[in-house]
Amino acid sequence: MLPEEHQVHGAFFGLWLCPDIPGLVWLGIVAVVFAVTLAKEANAQSRGVYPLGMSAANSGVTPEPGFTYSNQLLFYSRDEVKDQNGNTVPITGSNVVLMDMNSLIWVSAKELLGGARYSAFATLPFARNDLTSDIHGNISGGNGFADSYYVPFVLGWKRKRVALRLLYGFLAPTGRFAAGANDNVGSGYWTNALSSGQTFYVTKDMSWAFSAYEMYEFHTTQEGTGTHPGQTFDLDYSLARIFPFTKAPSLQIGIAGYQQRQTTATTGPAITPEETTERYAVNALGGLTNVTFSRPRVSLGFKFFEEFANRSTFQGYSVQFSGSVRF
């Protein structure tokens, strides 16, 4: 039996990872160079709003009919800045993001459109983010209720060795955001998201599963700044071995990864012509493990990702914990 916490895909919140950086103190030539460079990176090199890696396992699987509560604790730490060629920018500092994602999912027992099950869910997140440099200390950071994600339309199909899901959702800017503030938690703009998840059971006994989850983000203009973030393509994936023990919890172990690509230009009054040509890219590889208990119906999971070969963004690692319970 597959872990249910990874049967909830697309649940995410929008976090403006790199808020505006006002009032940096000028501490001589070195400090000026650092501040200008970091401000440029922070304004031009932000990522998409989807928390990468969270849907890497069992991406096409629909939960069983009824209600499921899912919680995911996602930690991202980045201590390198990459330019558009993938070279490390000589800046010392860190960008840390911590997210607590609370999702309530409902799945219908009825079938339609060739055996599809309809479902819907909402994700209410809490977040904390910090941007710190060795020269200036804490530059910006915020914590509190973040942007919430609502998915009113999900269709899921299941065949003998294939599971597929199609989703539409939108990100509402419910998190705190003010142009120029250094304690933002929300993104300050709406995002429409189309996504799909697939799980293919490679072997006849269904002990090996390959999963992939794709999302395309359509961003609107940011409130108060006039900045229109570029659209984003996200990809999570995994290859996992399932051990369905008869009198013990089932175990899933495998490799996992994620990618993210900016597909269109970021534009706005504060964006330079040079910055409109830049496109961020994120890559990561790691592993996952999940444990599922049949009574009560509880699932627990862990994932770790190490990023590499990023461009025009920060680079680091991610640690992710998850759990779910079906009512």
What would you call each of these model-derived segments?
Residues 69-77, 120-128, 166-174, 212-216, ...:
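Transmembrane beta-barrel strands of outer-membrane/channel proteins
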Residues 59, 71, 102-108, 150-156, ...:
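Residues on the lipid-exposed face of transmembrane beta-strands in outer-membrane beta-barrel proteins
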Residues 46-48, 76-99, 134-144:
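Surface-exposed strand-loop-strand hairpins of Gram-negative outer-membrane beta-barrel proteins
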Residues 82, 88, 224-327:
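Outer membrane beta-barrel transmembrane domains
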Residues 38-44:
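Sec/Tat signal peptide C-region and signal peptidase I cleavage site
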Residues 46, 59-66, 108-118, 157-164, ...:
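Short loop/turn motifs that connect adjacent beta-strands in outer-membrane beta-barrel proteins
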Residues 65, 94-102, 116, 139-149, ...:
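Residues that define the transmembrane beta-barrel architecture of outer-membrane proteins
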Residues 95-155:
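Long, hydrophobic/aromatic-enriched structural stretches that serve as scaffold segments
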